[in-house]
Amino acid sequence: MLHSGMVLAAPQSGSGKTTITCALLAAMKNRKLAVRAFKSGPDYIDPMFHRQVIGVPSRNLDTFFSGADQIRELYGYDRESFSYSVIEGAMGLYDGLGGTQKEGSAYHLAQTLDLPVVLVLDARGMGRTMVALLAGILQYDRDHRIIGVILNRTSEGFCRTMTPVIEEELGLPVLGCFPVQKSLHLESRHLGLKMPQEMEGLRQQVNQAAEKLEETADLDRMLQLLQSWALLHAFRDGKTKLPKLQEPGKDKGVLQKKKKQQEECPVIAVAKDEAFCFYYEDNLRLLEAYGGKLVWFSPLAQEKIPEEADALLLGGGYPELCARQLSENVSMRNSIREAIENGMPSVAECGGFMYLHESMTDEEGENWPMAGIITGSCHNRGKLVRFGYVNVTEQTSHFLAGKPVRAHEFHYYDSDNNGESCVAVKPVRGTSWTCIHEDDRNWWGYPHLYYPSNPAFVEHFVQAARLYHRERNAK
């Protein structure tokens, strides 16, 4: 069977994509189908839901972060181990950079990977208007990628009423509906959805949703459409088999760089708990590809960093929700501060950057002492401070080898000491600001970097960890 993929997209955010994606993944898993998941765009939280449902990593695919060749490489990685790929879109189907560009949109990703699109339409409070709405969306679909629609938040009876109208007037298959499920509600907070570990009984809720989707949607028809697309496009290209995008052992791709056997594999201690949990899977894989050995630790629960650590990676998350616990873990704060002051290389992004400050206010406005590496404090501004994609360049070259790295920001907190080592520039409007504290061994700031957009960042960080390892062993 040919590998089949799809992009599950919607006209706008809040249409129920994540709920239906999770229900679909669970239903496919219940059918014993080998399925994997991706998220279009830079979001961290949706892939966490995918992982909870299917038990394998879900990765981001983003046409701003990566060029077409790299996108195909990332999608091709491990593809032969799975029969299906489900990519959850971001925002509206055609919404890219700045809301006005194609680049970065779910549709652009579908074009890049030559995949079909299944729409999720929030049909609440609509009748024939949904035909007009779908007609407009189809008019923009010049590649004819949209192969079907699922009517969300509507009854089975009304779906049966509207199906012949939509199919006869638009020629668009209606793949069923998904009625409102009071038992399944993915709650949100200021950074988006609440994290899956915060939701009691998530697996049971998603399995119930999967059972309902099997009842109210025609998944057999959807899978047949995906297989037909894969066959048609394989034969169109003169092939009866999808091409291998990577040759094992010969690959020069960004995630498959061979480790130099003669060099040490430095240990990179990665913060991972309720406070620090935002990591791009491909960032972690690239650190390993360049020779780093990743070990996990919890700034919330453990007393100190791992003894074998040669470098620290403090990712994003929700440290403001755990400010008291982080502050009261004095031994960990001291351990991190002493390690960095003694020369251990470190990267801290967004939430990790906040943790390195002298203090941080929690959501109630109470101020808590933090690690004390960066002079200043972080406070909730009550509104989005910076949001969207940026290109980050250094004022003086340390980590980036003279090239930009692509990144994303989304935060309501701000620092009174954001740093001035780099300049961040928004790709459409050209708005810019200074950011980042860095030297040859440390990089601290709000932007969430996508490392494969500039692998020199990882190469420099791992080499700094390797140098620290040698220095420590020489003492």
Spell out what each predicted region is:
Residues 2-19, 25-113, 121-148, 156-160:
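ATP-dependent carboxylate-amine ligase catalytic core
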Residues 7, 86-88, 118-120, 150, ...:
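Structural motif
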Residues 39, 174-182, 293-301:
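Beta-strand->loop->alpha-helix junctions that form or flank phosphate-binding loops
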Residues 110, 219, 263-264, 276-289, ...:
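C-terminal and late-domain segments of enzyme folds
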Residues 115, 172, 341-345:
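A short helix->loop->beta-strand "cap" motif at the edges of active sites that frequently abuts
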Residues 127-260:
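Internal gly/pro-rich beta-alpha loop/helix module
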Residues 252-253, 258, 264-330, 334-341:
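Phosphate-binding active sites in nucleotide-utilizing proteins
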Residues 294, 319-396:
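Cysteine-nucleophile active-site neighborhood
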